[in-house]
């Protein structure tokens, strides 16, 4: 009798244990959703605003891996975050449409214009997350004899000859030159270059290796706050815009996480994001009347005046032939 009783108890005990193990296995085997992107190229608040079902996987050494973003699409990826300069590297066939209808309806004119410039193949497969203006960063500006200090023309000051670190993007530099009236001769802007180095532009200026650099505001904010030798200029002619965007791989069955948007750009994060040099893809005109806790000197740079913001522009995607012509014009200058 005791033997039978023990047998029944053991059976029940092991049966319950087996059930618990099965349930535990199911819970732990559920794979987290994968967000991939380059660290520090987008606001970290974006990761924090996603649910705990998501995990961030950094993309490393993208400069030396030409197809890193496409490689990510072949891995387990549910969402991809990238800068607009990399969009053309993505195959449209590998992306699915991002509807997010209610959010798209609230996008600003700048965001809508940016998407239109991507063309029909991309505009519904790319979603703008944040935007940051390209600015001029100076080191010891007050000690430099600069001309036209509110304009891109300041780049042509003799004190900056061979002293500016430019982004390695002829397209962006040509767009600035054309804003100043240059058509096909870009030798003047080339003569001012110390280097064409996106990745190390900030280090060049901070270390004293260059007097100025052209870079996105979001990439130099921390140093600007800490280092009193640094200052920035948002030219009155406006500036190119650096967009941080999202893409959703076709192979992912996960719906686009629309709920994160209000959390990301809600009251908790808004001022923090702006102080990091990012602006929302929706209208921010009401923010000009609010205190965002930045120095008075930089208030109109972190939240540009409408007269300047209306002159800012995004770079549309170029066809293969247009890229070829642009390269020829740049190289022949």
Show where each model-derived region lies.
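A structural signal for short loop-to-beta-strand junctions that line the ligand-binding cleft
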Residues: 77-79, 97-135
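N-terminal secretory signal peptides and thylakoid transit peptides that target proteins
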Residues: 1-19
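Ligand-binding pocket segment of bilobal, Venus flytrap-like solute-binding proteins
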Residues: 84-90, 165-237
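Extracellular/periplasmic juxtamembrane helices and adjacent flexible linkers that interface
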Residues: 255, 263-333
């Amino acid at each position: 009798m005791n033997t039978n009783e023990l047998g029944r108890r053991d059976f029940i005990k092991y049966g319950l244990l087996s059930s618990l193990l099965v349930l535990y296995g199911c819970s732990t085997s559920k794979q987290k959703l994968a967000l991939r992107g380059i660290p520090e190229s987008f606001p970290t608040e974006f990761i924090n605003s996603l649910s705990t079902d998501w995990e961030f996987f950094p993309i490393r050494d993208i400069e030396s891996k030409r197809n890193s973003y496409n490689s990510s699409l072949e891995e387990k990826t549910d969402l991809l975050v990238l800068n607009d300069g990399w969009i053309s590297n993505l195959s449209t066939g590998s992306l699915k449409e991002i509807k997010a209808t209610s959010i798209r309806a609230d996008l600003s004119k700048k965001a809508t214009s940016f998407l239109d410039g991507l063309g029909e193949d991309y505009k519904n497969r790319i979603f703008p997350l944040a935007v940051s203006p390209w600015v001029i960063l100076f080191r010891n500006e007050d000690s430099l004899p600069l001309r036209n200090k509110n304009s891109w023309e300041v780049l042509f000051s003799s004190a900056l000859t061979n002293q500016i670190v430019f982004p390695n993007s002829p397209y962006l530099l040509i767009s600035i030159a054309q804003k100043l009236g240059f058509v096909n001769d870009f030798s003047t802007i080339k003569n001012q270059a110390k280097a064409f180095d996106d990745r190390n532009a900030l280090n060049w200026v901070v270390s004293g290796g260059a007097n100025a650099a052209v870079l996105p505001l979001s990439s130099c904010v921390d140093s600007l706050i800490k280092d009193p030798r640094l200052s920035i200029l948002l030219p009155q002619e406006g500036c190119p815009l650096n967009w941080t965007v999202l893409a959703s791989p076709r192979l992912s069955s996960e719906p686009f996480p629309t709920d994160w948007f209000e959390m990301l750009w809600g009251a908790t994060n808004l001022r923090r994001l702006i102080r990091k040099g990012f602006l929302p893809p929706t209208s921010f005109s009401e923010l000009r009347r609010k205190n965002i806790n930045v120095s008075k000197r930089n208030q109109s740079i972190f939240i540009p005046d409408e007269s300047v913001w209306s002159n800012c522009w995004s770079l549309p995607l170029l066809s293969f032939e247009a890229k070829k012509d642009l390269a020829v014009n740049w190289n022949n200058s």
